[in-house]
């Protein structure tokens, strides 16, 4: 899905349209983008921003590298891997956040309070090799082995995979 979030005054101007694919659902990491649109900063620079919402976890890099989007929000480590291992022609032009925004969460009735409580549980992670590595590192640092928990790639379905019982 997508949305044209430029203000109405942009319609009267001759603006260059720029498509931006998000890395995830709109969230706090994208505040600066929406704020600049709302304040008219892009229009002042002659740009009309069209925000695209991804349908899967690699849309930002695949759409950008295929020329179907001008800019994609993506994860630094995945851009490096794409360049190094898959020869995908994308470059990093800036950082939206300065630190990873990964979190560990579960439903309250699962009684998971620490990483050690994940023993015997099904752990969902969002669609990348690095996210899987983050989970494995958390387990190791808590004194658990990789096979002490079941790791499941749930893509964008982090919340629904918990509420449906697919993961803990």
Predicted segments, located by residue:
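Short, low-complexity, disordered segments immediately C-terminal to signal peptides
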Residues: 1-15
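Short, glycine-/small- and polar/acidic-enriched structural segments
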Residues: 11-154, 160-164, 168
